[in-house]
């Protein structure tokens, strides 16, 4: 089913009144322009999206890994059509602005990045991120000039939309085993000039490195938290100038961790004490009521 059709059929199921896409696009951009940092959590299905909306979060972001795990696949194996249908389902679940993990634009060419932005808009999204590394194992980042061309093409596609779409450009050095801060900064500066609205270098773990990135660019910076060994609070991140904090697949992996602990308890001990940590049936049902 095409994302736009899925969105149209699912719209009535949304939790709360729906804003128009231009209104959501403007609201999402406003979050990046106000004082302080905000958290944009990453649901992996309509149910978790509605729970996060119920808890009062102001915007959501998809997680490619979290979604892949939910359908029994490793990260990086979901195609563009399925990704867009999934994004449309997240959009339709609530009235919140949604930004998507668009991987590398599902192709190496600048035209692939541009086309993915157009499809993201059709799916109801008001933001999306483009990575600078191929969707192949053990890949190095694209050569800088090619990476710039890809961001520039995506930014041009954004400018051709009829509403505000927030484009995030990602520098993947640290996630592909190349922890080069200078090259990361050089790339983010280039992506800024190519038209990115938000800059993001996942994998930065120290406050000093994050601060160095922020001081080197003049666009809002996203960081990812929820990584093991990284204990920086929202207040600490806001104090050094971070604007947006996502959590990637960590909510999904946290839920899967609880699932596996419960399953192993049953298998290994034949006991069911895990139930004491479960949310009550009444509480979870109430959260899903319109």
Per-segment meaning from a language model:
Residues 22-31, 38-97, 106-219, 223, ...:
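Alpha/beta enzyme core
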